[in-house]
């Protein structure tokens, strides 16, 4: 019997293209599914430089009549991940410096065309191309691939099932309705009962409306997005499709993120069996960031996008107070985002030389060494579908201080302040409610009180390092889902209500312009 085959349709996949956690998640899941016996491939754009990083390139098809002009589909192998890739080549659309944004940090004006072309390529594969197996499952990732289920439905391809995974509902791919003809979306689907939301064509809504099944990346986030507060205008549709929504938690690459063998750490590697060696990584981080060489200092790290979603506005208020109240506190920050927050954090570092350091930007080596050297990680967020960064921190013995939202409410164990210090012997981190500076500041204070109790702190570190968040665990629910979909007869068209959009939170209103969905670093 032939193996089940799935084709993941995505805008990015590590290591060929990555802007954030989406790229990590796609590759991590694809590798786990492949190990479990699913014939798994990845379809994505051939961005600048991608073809130089793959081997065994073979021509599959010339695709005429595509949004954005003629394109070529090639197959290749990525030697770093061991996965087969199918790359959509159209230099006019994809040969650019950035994946999604121009030099001014704005979404490319033709993002609707760029990612509609990707969806049309997936539909052509589903219809059948010589030299390429037709997949049983088309697995669309986030809004960039949101048109895939719609196009498969419109083409009447009943033998191919579609799944949409929502990584971040706040980023929806919303474009002027007038572009529908240009991107090949039939007018019958551009209605309030179809892909239209707020008078615009919405790629995420298209996926949610027409996918056979929907998944999202944590249990708590699945509950949240069915509420007006977190549903970003799509909660009525999500509630209508609740029976088709499966919360399947993400995983992390526990081989890549392993302090015992991390190539980014070199001689600084350590493990849960010899956590005392973490002190060497702490000393190295202090030296690299220009912090005072003090093993007794509590070293708090922050590594995320500097945006309102990630509560950078709260951090710039809470951290100065924390540094003032706690003379032994040190802070090391890496990240990039809104310039006003970058400036304020750089000013904070100038005010506290030797105790606070900020690196604007991001690179993998610094990120790994940040987790290795830190005692604790600050990860505030107004919404967080999953939350990879706190899991990386736990893996490296850095205790997370995080908002009680999304996936972090599922993955971080915190018995609560009312239970007393001894209850924290079973904890893996500290969670806080609210999005104000006092809320974050109180959580930092609480962490420092626990840090002053070595037995409790070491227990929290060990608990976090022992947690199993690898992709092999996350892959099994997808195996069950795919098996059920392939074996079961295809359902009839799922009715959806006429949507009366819920009021949008401010952060969501600013996110509906075709922006990418960059998850946490």
Swiss-Prot record:
<keyword id="KW-0320">Glycogen biosynthesis</keyword>
<dbReference type="Pfam" id="PF08323">
    <property type="entry name" value="Glyco_transf_5"/>
</dbReference>
<dbReference type="GO" id="GO:0004373">
    <property type="term" value="F:alpha-1,4-glucan glucosyltransferase (UDP-glucose donor) activity"/>
</dbReference>
<comment type="function">
    <text>Synthesizes alpha-1,4-glucan chains using ADP-glucose.</text>
</comment>
<dbReference type="GO" id="GO:0005978">
    <property type="term" value="P:glycogen biosynthetic process"/>
</dbReference>
<feature type="binding site">
    <location>
        <position position="18"/>
    </location>
    <ligand>
        <name>ADP-alpha-D-glucose</name>
    </ligand>
</feature>
<keyword id="KW-0808">Transferase</keyword>
<dbReference type="InterPro" id="IPR013534">
    <property type="entry name" value="Starch_synth_cat_dom"/>
</dbReference>
<dbReference type="GO" id="GO:0009011">
    <property type="term" value="F:alpha-1,4-glucan glucosyltransferase (ADP-glucose donor) activity"/>
</dbReference>
<comment type="pathway">
    <text>Glycan biosynthesis; glycogen biosynthesis.</text>
</comment>
<keyword id="KW-0328">Glycosyltransferase</keyword>
<protein>
    <recommendedName>
        <fullName>Glycogen synthase</fullName>
        <ecNumber>2.4.1.21</ecNumber>
    </recommendedName>
</protein>
<dbReference type="Pfam" id="PF00534">
    <property type="entry name" value="Glycos_transf_1"/>
</dbReference>
<comment type="similarity">
    <text>Belongs to the glycosyltransferase 1 family. Bacterial/plant glycogen synthase subfamily.</text>
</comment>
<dbReference type="InterPro" id="IPR001296">
    <property type="entry name" value="Glyco_trans_1"/>
</dbReference>
<dbReference type="InterPro" id="IPR011835">
    <property type="entry name" value="GS/SS"/>
</dbReference>
